[in-house]
Amino acid sequence: MLPLHISLEKKKVVIAGGGSIALRRLKTVISEGADITLVSPDVEPEIKQMAEERRIKWEKRTIEKEDYLNAFFIIAATDNAAVNKEIAQSASPFQLVNCVSDAELGNVYMPKIVKRGHVTVSVSTSGASPKHTKELAENVDKLIDGDFVAEVNRLYQMRRKK
C-alpha cells in the first residue's frame, strides 16, 4: 500500500459502529474538518457528547447501505464482523474503506499518526499488529525534537510568504 496524506476537509465520512474502536477512528478524522456521520444504535459516552456538541451527526440505528452510498470515506467499525464485511464489499471501488475486523477487506489502513506542529509521521504495520504500531509510534514521537519542530514551523511560515 502507498502511504498518502489525504485531506478530509468537508468530505463525507461515515462511521459504522459506536464502540471503542469507532471512537479511536473518529478521533483521528474529526480534527481534519470532515463532515462525519456515525451510525450505531449505541455509542461510547464521548461519541454521544460529540454529537450533542454538533461536532458529528449521530444516527441512532443500525447502518444501511444508503448511509454510505455517497461517502468519500467509510469506516466499518461495528462489533459484528459480518456487518463490517458487508459494508466493505458493497462499497464502490471509488470509495475509501477501512474495515476494522478484517483490514484486507478495505482499501485503506489507518496508521498511527504522530503530529507535532507541521511535522507529521504516519506509522503502520499494514494491519498486522496494532500493538506494535502503537509502540513504534511512541518511539518515533520521542525522536522528534522540539527544536526540529520549531525549525520546520519557521520554514513553513517562510514558504507561505513567497
Curated annotation (Swiss-Prot):
GO terms for biological process: cobalamin biosynthetic process; siroheme biosynthetic process. The keyword Oxidoreductase applies. It holds the Pfam family NAD_binding_7. Its EC number is 1.3.1.76. It comes from the Bacteria. Keywords: Cobalamin biosynthesis, NAD, Oxidoreductase, Porphyrin biosynthesis. GO terms for molecular function: ferrochelatase activity; precorrin-2 dehydrogenase activity. The keyword NAD applies. It is an enzyme of class 1 (oxidoreductase). It catalyses: precorrin-2 + NAD(+) = sirohydrochlorin + NADH + 2 H(+). Pathway: Cofactor biosynthesis; adenosylcobalamin biosynthesis; sirohydrochlorin from precorrin-2: step 1/1; Porphyrin-containing compound metabolism; siroheme biosynthesis; sirohydrochlorin from precorrin-2: step 1/1. InterPro entries: Met8-like, NAD(P)-bd_dom_sf, Sirohaem_synthase_N. Gene3D superfamilies: NAD(P)-binding Rossmann-like Domain (3.40.50.720). Disruption phenotype: Cells lacking this gene are unable to grow on minimal medium with nitrate as nitrogen source. Growth is restored only after addition of both cysteine and ammonia to the medium. NAD(+) binds at S20, I21, P41, D42. Induction: Up-regulated by sulfur starvation and repressed by cysteine. Also induced by O-acetyl-L-serine (OAS), a direct precursor of cysteine, maybe via inactivation of a putative transcriptional repressor of the cysH operon whose activity is controlled by the intracellular levels of OAS. Catalyzes the dehydrogenation of precorrin-2 to form sirohydrochlorin which is used as a precursor in both siroheme biosynthesis and in the anaerobic branch of adenosylcobalamin biosynthesis. Belongs to the precorrin-2 dehydrogenase / sirohydrochlorin ferrochelatase family. This is Precorrin-2 dehydrogenase. The gene is sirC.
